[in-house]
Design a protein with these regions (language model features):
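ATP-binding glycine-rich loop module of kinase domains
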Residues: 146-175
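Active-site catalytic-loop/activation-segment of kinase and kinase-like phosphoryl-transfer enzymes
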Residues: 247-307, 390-396
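Conserved kinase catalytic-core helix
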Residues: 216-267, 301, 308-311
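Conserved alpha/beta core of the MobA/IspD/sugar-nucleotide pyrophosphorylase nucleotidyltransferase superfamily
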Residues: 63, 78-156
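Active-site acidic catalytic loop and adjacent metal/ATP-binding pocket
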Residues: 150-153, 300-352
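Active-site activation/catalytic loop segments of kinase-like enzymes and analogous catalytic loops
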Residues: 344-403, 420-435
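ATP/Mg2+ or Mg2+-diphosphate-binding catalytic cores
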Residues: 389-464
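Conserved HxN/HPN-centered segment at the entrance to the catalytic loop
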Residues: 184-197
């Protein structure tokens, strides 16, 4: 391109010289890019070329005008001819399009997307991202609390969800994909359209259906009784089709590793973080005007002997691992449902972890916190707009009633401790990826831990 520019300027200098106005290449640069660049007054008497031969002035005018006329004439060509010309001259290989790779539905989604994929820390993945998503339009970002990205996309054939991740997160997503394939004959799960694992990247596409919505939305747009019935069906199906057929005895070594990694490891990360270290120095916190014991004041809850005794009685088997409200998908046109986004690598694979995840939603209000944009911290005070619906309260009461009827009190206490540990496991991710709101999720951990402590000390018999 630059050689063509220089060739054009050199030819113009030679032509003007022949036409009676001696010009060097440097003079052409001065004419085109100097103070009076593209000033046609230069052709008039008194201008830079006002005294030049008429042929030189007409030549310069033609040099400017003829390309403009050619571009205008190209717009008059038949559409088929113009399309063929565009295809022949495009820079990208035929069939490859990068025009619609930003989320189209929401401006905030576009900003987050650009920050995530074109920040310096992600530049190694940009090429793979472009190759993976050629020929599709990204409509909306549905990513939640993980390092994988979920986008609503469309191509020339259909609309679908695409989930993908790179590096270690890609390996984790590949484990999720293996779980979905292994359990597809046992459980109602999302339909996988296609997938690929290569070069440190994993992705898969899921069927999109406008009548399928997350249970959070379903719960707040339908009678609570319908959501209660679906949730009971989900738990009964998991019990009969997954937990019981895969049941094995509890493994003391895995319980020990679970405590060491998921409890001690995450507590250590909290104590080492500068912002949380200051918050954790107080004996109590005032969260939205209510006083709670701070986490260090509840350290007896994380005593190893206590946890070993609690978890030794846990049932063990294959589990979903991330049974939050948003991972239960409900159909609005009938009473069916299916599950998405399992989580592997929990070490202590107990159904009680699934129940704990469900309580992280219904008791801890995780989904409402995810929709809360900001938090204020001053000394030992943490304030944010915590919204909670009557529908959540009703569903929590139903779940606690079912758990209390099915399990003795000590096992319900174990389920509640797994909820606390889920909040504990969430914190390093929030400190790394969502630091501005991390104090709010720490407050969620503290509030849940206080409720569970009261239950363990028999100060209350239920959470609601």
């Amino acid at each position: 391109m630059w050689a063509a520019y220089l060739g054009s300027y050199t030819a113009l200098a030679a032509a003007l010289t022949v036409a009676g106005e001696p010009m060097r290449l440097v003079d052409v640069f001065g004419l085109l890019f100097g103070r009076n660049a593209a000033d046609f007054a230069a052709l008039l008497p008194g201008g830079a070329l006002g005294t030049a031969a008429p042929a030189a002035r007409w030549l310069l005018l033609a040099w400017f005008v003829l390309p403009l006329l050619a571009m205008w004439a190209a717009t008059l060509l038949p559409e088929g001819v113009r399309g063929a010309m565009n295809q022949a001259t495009q820079a990208a290989p035929a069939g490859e399009s990068y025009l619609n790779l930003l989320p189209q539905a929401d401006e905030h989604d576009r900003a987050v997307f650009l920050s995530r994929y074109f920040g310096l820390e992600n530049k190694d993945y940009v090429k793979r991202f472009l190759q993976m998503n050629r020929g599709i339009t990204i409509l909306e970002d549905y990513s939640a609390g993980s390092n994988a990205t979920t986008m609503l996309c469309m191509d020339t054939q259909s609309t679908f969800y695409r989930k993908y991740a790179f590096g270690k997160d890609g390996a984790k997503l590949a484990e999720q994909l293996d779980w979905l394939r292994a359990q597809q004959d046992r459980l109602p799960l999302c339909d996988i359209l296609r997938s690929e694992e290569a070069d440190g990247c994993c992705w898969y596409d899921m069927v999109y259906n406008p009548q399928a919505v997350g249970m959070f939305r379903y719960l707040h747009s339908n009678p609570v009784e319908k959501s209660r019935a679906i949730l009971r069906a989900v738990l009964a199906t998991l019990e009969d089709k997954l937990y019981k057929p895969t049941a094995v005895p509890a493994d003391a070594e895995k319980i020990e590793k679970y405590i060491e990694t998921k409890v001690d490891g995450n507590l250590k990360k909290l104590h080492e973080d500068r912002m949380l270290r200051e918050l954790m120095s107080y004996d109590t916190l005032r969260i939205n005007g209510v006083e709670y014991k701070n986490l260090p004041a509840l350290d007896w809850m994380f005593d190893h002997d206590r946890l070993r005794n609690l978890f030794a009685k846990d049932p063990v088997g294959t589990i979903h691992g991330d049974l939050t409200i948003e991972n239960i998908i409900c159909r609005t046109d009938n009473d069916s449902w299916y599950l998405i986004d399992p989580n592997t690598g929990n070490l202590h694979e107990s159904p009680f972890l699934d129940y704990g995840k469900l309580l992280q939603s219904l008791h801890g209000s995780y989904e409402f916190m995810m929709k809360t944009p900001r938090v204020a911290v001053q000394d030992n005070r943490i304030d944010f707009q915590l919204t909670r619906s009557a529908a959540y309260d009703a569903l929590l009461a139903a779940v606690m009633e079912d758990l209390s009827a099915r399990y003795p009190r000590e096992q319900v206490e174990s389920i509640l401790m797994h909820e606390v540990i889920h909040w504990l496991r969430l914190m390093p991710y929030k400190l790394n990826k969502d630091r501005k709101r991390a104090a709010m999720f720490y407050a969620g951990l503290v509030m849940v831990a206080n409720d569970v402590a009261d239950f363990s000390e028999h100060k209350k018999e239920t959470l609601c």
